């Protein structure tokens, strides 16, 4: 079940409490999205995974707050806000823009000397070193943004039919695209933990851009393909969650076997 935490930590508006949890899974949304995109995940994940959807400023419960202007600022502030929650085993998942944020968080925690995630899941995103700077070119007006929403899929039809909902969606999407356009990759040392890429077969991200994530992984690297386009995580939700569950289960076993025996 969910416990609202918005008055304590605005980045984590709802926390999936499970007394049997062995690992926390922080989930970061795509451009234009919010924590609610993960609302159905809790009931489909096992009790040993505690789901922690991340809410970015300027949307849903944080609609009254100004949208972020810099990805690094988001990473730094979010990293600070979850420090008390990463002392226990955890993993990071991010889709599209959220994948960049999840990667940035893992790197930030490492640079701070803090615990590292057991695993990083990056979904529907080219590696930071291989992002296409032309992908978002021209997406700076309502007509272009609406066309992009329709092409990407994943936006409910009722959003297009409601002027109010559409306005909110376009404003958040435009702010997030500005955030992404300002992103510049600066080479970093590989991360020390496993990295798992999830991708849609019909997405327009070239496979070489996905495989380039391996350069970021100092630990094990894996890539899973799913039927569908950019929002395959909705079209194939059950398969995506089963993949995450299996990967985390194996990783917990590896870590427990590698831990020194108690004296």
Residue positions per predicted region:
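Domain-scale detector for complete catalytic domains at protein termini or as standalone homologs
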Residues: 2-93, 100-263
């Amino acid at each position: 079940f969910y416990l609202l935490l918005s008055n304590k930590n605005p980045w984590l508006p709802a926390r999936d409490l499970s007394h049997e949890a062995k690992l926390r899974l922080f989930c970061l949304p795509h451009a234009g999205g919010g924590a609610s995109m993960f609302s159905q995940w809790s009931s489909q994940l096992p009790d040993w995974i505690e789901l922690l959807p991340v809410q970015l400023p300027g949307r849903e419960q944080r609609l009254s707050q100004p949208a972020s202007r810099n990805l690094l600022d988001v990473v730094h502030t979010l990293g600070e806000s979850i420090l008390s929650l990463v002392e226990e085993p955890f993993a990071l998942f991010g889709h599209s823009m959220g994948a960049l944020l999840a990667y940035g968080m893992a790197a930030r925690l490492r640079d701070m000397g803090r615990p590292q995630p057991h695993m990083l899941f990056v979904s529907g995103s080219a590696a930071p070193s291989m992002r296409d700077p032309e992908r978002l070119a021209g997406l700076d007006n309502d007509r272009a943004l609406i066309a992009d929403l329709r092409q990407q899929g994943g936006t409910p039809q009722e959003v297009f039919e409601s002027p109010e909902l559409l306005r909110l969606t376009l404003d958040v999407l435009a702010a997030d695209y500005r955030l992404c356009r300002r992103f510049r990759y600066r080479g970093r040392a590989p991360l020390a933990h496993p990295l798992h890429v999830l991708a849609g077969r019909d997405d327009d991200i070239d496979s070489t851009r996905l495989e380039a994530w391996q350069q970021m992984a100092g630990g094990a690297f894996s890539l899973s393909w799913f039927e569908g386009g950019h929002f395959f995580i909705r079209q194939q939700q059950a398969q995506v969650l089963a993949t995450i569950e299996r990967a985390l289960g194996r990783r917990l076993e590896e870590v427990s076997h590698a831990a020194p025996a108690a004296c």
